[in-house]
């Protein structure tokens, strides 16, 4: 019963992300409110213009839409990170998976936001669990495959088909909300994603050292391209290993304006 109350309370919070509530004044009253640092019995959570403006006790503001949460638990919405919600239905069915790309000329420039499905059956299921936002992370289409005990091929989306893309990068992540409606995208291209560890080593040729060398060389090429676009346009620049689309996508990473999400499993890889 307690689990049901928690789910119902979390679902209430998810509903508040809906555009219908975006410009309204709403109060959730009577519930057991978990703030993250304390527990408020018979609490009142006030939301105005889509944002929580107060959490406490007492009466709801005059004119507020009341959501009765008596007998329920109200908690902040959860954020799912490293998620495929809305981008993949069944991972084993290729036609339903828009999280990876095998084209040789598109790796860093791959943008998962174009493949998001607001009608995905995964969204309402996650919403019932209290998830209100998610970071949708692309998976790399290539990798070493492999079948030994420490294989990372299932991490960062590396498939069994072997190397499909020469790029070290899986693509660009996006943020979505899980409210009902057709526009679930909050922000596209929020971060670049790159698998490291054994998965990344397989992409680079089999060794971690090779991946780090290739990674540094790639960023050097991106900086060279960014300084010499005109020369690149007139074929006056040396051959570069990436397509123009990938070079453009990596400029924000090279200059520090876009975060880089690195996926690893081993402590030694994190320390690198």
Please give the residue ranges for each predicted region.
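Sec/Tat signal peptide C-region and signal peptidase I cleavage site
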Residues: 18-22
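Bacterial N-terminal signal peptides
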Residues: 9-17
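Soluble non-cytosolic domains of exported or imported proteins
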Residues: 100, 104, 113-120, 206-209, ...
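Polyanionic/metal-chelating signatures
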Residues: 127-272
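Short, solvent-exposed loop/turn and secondary-structure capping segments
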Residues: 57, 78, 88-93, 145-154, ...
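Histidine-rich, glycine-flanked metal-binding segment
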Residues: 33, 37-75, 92
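Bacterial N-terminal signal peptides that target proteins for export
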Residues: 1-8
């Amino acid at each position: 019963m307690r689990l049901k109350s928690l789910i119902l309370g979390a679902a209430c919070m998810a509903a508040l992300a809906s555009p219908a509530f975006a410009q309204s004044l709403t109060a959730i009253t009577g519930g057991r409110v978990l703030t993250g640092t304390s527990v408020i019995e018979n609490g009142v959570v006030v939301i105005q213009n889509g944002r929580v403006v107060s959490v406490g006790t007492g009466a709801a503001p005059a004119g507020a839409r009341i959501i009765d949460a008596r007998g329920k638990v109200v908690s902040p919405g959860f954020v799912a990170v490293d998620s495929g919600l809305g981008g993949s239905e069944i991972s084993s069915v290729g036609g339903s998976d828009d999280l990876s790309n095998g084209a040789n000329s598109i790796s860093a420039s791959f943008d998962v936001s174009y493949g998001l499905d607001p009608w995905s059956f995964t969204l309402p299921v996650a919403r019932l669990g209290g998830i209100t936002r998610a970071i949708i992370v692309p998976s790399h289409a290539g990798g070493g495959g492999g079948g030994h005990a420490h294989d990372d091929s299932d991490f960062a989306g590396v498939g069994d088909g072997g190397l499909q893309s020469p790029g070290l990068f899986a693509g660009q992540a996006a943020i979505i909300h899980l409210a009902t409606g057709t526009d679930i995208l909050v922000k596209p291209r929020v971060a670049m994603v790159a698998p490291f560890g054994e998965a990344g080593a397989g992409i680079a040729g089999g060794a971690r050292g090779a991946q780090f060398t290739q990674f540094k060389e790639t960023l050097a090429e991106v900086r060279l391209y960014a300084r010499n676009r005109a020369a690149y346009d007139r074929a006056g620049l040396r051959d570069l290993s990436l397509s123009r689309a990938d070079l453009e996508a990596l400029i924000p990473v090279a200059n520090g304006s876009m975060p880089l999400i690195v996926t690893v499993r081993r402590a030694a890889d994190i320390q690198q």
